Design a protein with these regions (language model features):
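Low-complexity, Gly/Ser/Thr/Pro-rich intrinsically disordered linker/tail segments
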Residues: 250-286
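Alpha-helical substrate-recognition element adjacent to the catalytic core
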Residues: 19-176, 189-192, 257-261
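Short, surface-exposed basic-aromatic patches at helix termini and helix-loop junctions that form
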Residues: 142-149, 206-210, 230-239
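Conserved Lys-Pro-Asp/Glu-containing loop-to-beta segment of HAD-superfamily phosphomonoesterases
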Residues: 198-229
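N-terminal signal peptide c-region/cleavage motif recognized by signal peptidases
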Residues: 13-15
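Sec-dependent signal peptide recognition
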Residues: 1-8
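Structural beta-sheet core signal
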Residues: 128, 218, 243-245
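A short alpha/beta connector and helix-capping loop motif
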Residues: 64-76, 229-251
Length: 286
């Protein structure tokens, strides 16, 4: 721990070296400790959070990150087609959205909300950065409200989020990032990327805001997103970026992707849901 403190202090003294520092943590108590030891000005600090398996997680395997990654990989590789829920990507998105509506989510750690409330009370700014697309916007808002990510009747991300040069904190239209081919949406403090690169997305956001950000804490459960942040910010000498790989849910994700028994159970659960949908919806596409 003294070494970490020394390293961080040295970065502030010598800004030319202030690039990206990597961490691998499995609790928000540890993230809170990291934040406190950093001792940066909260008003120039941006905390960026992934949603799925970082802030919130499915209460059962069906519809979870592990389930999605398993199915998406099967579609990509063409391997084991008999294990696919559907060979069509857009249909898989629709299935995911149904499961989001049916299955409850919960916070990944009991310290998630206390930490977010604490840092935002100090003046820190927060941003949600999710791989979900616009199709999941309604379900996402419902899940966050159900788990008390709110300040009064507003989402915490909206109330304590970024302020853009147009003085808005919630853009109802598309978020224009020229490097992206897919439609990216920013609403109520959350950026819906539809799978686009998170490092490039964060660079795009920073180019459009009013606030001067000096420190970023990025927290995500996926290694690929940690790598993306590293590539995007490794040459940014004006920022200190703490790149946190949050690993608490990773074992659960891998088990879903590699355990045939769990996979069979997921098929059976989905078939029950699908049959029920076919009974109540005429000419269901499922």
């Amino acid at each position: 721990m003294p070494f970490i403190l020394f390293l961080i202090c040295s970065l502030f003294i010598n800004p030319i070296f202030a690039r990206v520092i990597h961490y691998e943590l499995d609790s928000f108590a540890d993230i809170a400790t990291l934040y406190e030891e950093m001792r940066s000005d909260p008003r120039s600090t941006l905390l960026v959070f992934d949603l799925d398996d970082t802030l919130i997680t499915m209460t059962q395997p069906l519809g979870s990150v592990g389930w999605w990654d398993w199915q998406a990989e099967l579609q990509k590789t063409g391997k084991d087609p008999d294990k696919l829920f559907t060979p069509d990507y857009q249909q898989l998105v629709r299935i995911q959205n149904i499961l989001f509506q049916l299955i409850k989510m919960e916070v990944t750690d009991k310290y998630v909300l206390p930490f977010l409330n604490h840092v935002t009370d100090q003046g820190a700014i927060i941003l949600g950065l999710t791989a979900r697309g616009k199709d999941h916007l309604s379900a996402t808002m419902m899940q966050l409200k159900d788990n008390n990510f709110t300040v009064g009747d507003k989402l915490l991300f909206q109330e304590k989020g970024l302020k853009f040069r147009n003085n808005k904190t919630s853009l109802a239209d598309n978020f224009q990032c020229p490097q992206f081919s897919k439609e990216v949406i920013y609403q109520r403090g959350i950026m819906f990327l539809d799978g686009e690169d998170k490092g490039q997305a964060l660079l795009c956001v920073l180019s459009k805001i009013k606030t001067e950000i000096k420190t970023i804490i990025f927290v995500d459960d996926a290694k690929r997103n940690s790598v993306s942040i590293d590539k995007a910010f490794t040459d940014r000498n004006d920022l200190l970026v703490l790149n946190v790989l949050y690993t608490k849910e990773n074992t659960k994700e891998l088990e879903i992707q590699n355990n045939p028994l769990i996979q069979q159970q997921l098929f059976e659960q989905w078939n029950q849901i699908k049959n029920h949908l076919n009974e109540i919806i005429v000419q269901s596409n499922f």
